[in-house]
Amino acid sequence: MPRKGYTKRQEILPDPIYNSKLVSRLINKLMLDGKRGTASTILYDAFDRIKEATGNDPLEVFEQAMENIMPVLEVKARRVGGSNYQVPIEVRPDRRSTLGLRWLVNYSRLRNEHTMDERLAKEIMDAANDTGASVKKREDTHKMAEANRAFAHYRW
């Protein structure tokens, strides 16, 4: 542990268009090689596609998608008496959103649509409708935690 205490988390400014910190964090997750302009263009184009396809506010669709993606439980490896147990633990709120954004971006990149903004828009719309690869990842995480519920008493 550090002797001088912990550093404060850097405050993330909300994005200029939707005034949302979550959107700003998504832009940061999308960004490759420091190209924030490219990442924000991709995101705003994806939001335009969502507005065209659904007719709803893209921020509301995105927030619904994030609600469907963010995990409540996960498993963490714990070594007890020479064997490793997968111990289910609750996920902290900040980690919930971090995992949700990470899964959303990763599974968007794996999709087969032509452009990244199209992939991201489709993944967000799928997640808002409780389908898609990122929602499946959340379900798999919850299943793993449920399967290892017997080891919950090893929680620390």
Curated annotation (Swiss-Prot):
Gene3D superfamilies: Ribosomal protein S7 domain. One of its GO terms (biological process) is translation. InterPro entries: Ribosomal_uS7, Ribosomal_uS7_bac/org-type, Ribosomal_uS7_CS, Ribosomal_uS7_dom, Ribosomal_uS7_dom_sf. GO terms for molecular function: rRNA binding; structural constituent of ribosome; tRNA binding. The keyword RNA-binding applies. Keywords: Ribonucleoprotein, Ribosomal protein, RNA-binding, rRNA-binding, tRNA-binding. GO terms for cellular component: small ribosomal subunit. The keyword Transit peptide does not apply. It holds the Pfam family Ribosomal_S7. NCBIfam families: rpsG_bact. Belongs to the universal ribosomal protein uS7 family. HAMAP family: Ribosomal_uS7_B. One of the primary rRNA binding proteins, it binds directly to 16S rRNA where it nucleates assembly of the head domain of the 30S subunit. Is located at the subunit interface close to the decoding center, probably blocks exit of the E-site tRNA. Part of the 30S ribosomal subunit. Contacts proteins S9 and S11. This is Small ribosomal subunit protein uS7. It comes from Leuconostoc mesenteroides subsp. mesenteroides (strain ATCC 8293 / DSM 20343 / BCRC 11652 / CCM 1803 / JCM 6124 / NCDO 523 / NBRC 100496 / NCIMB 8023 / NCTC 12954 / NRRL B-1118 / 37Y). The gene is rpsG.
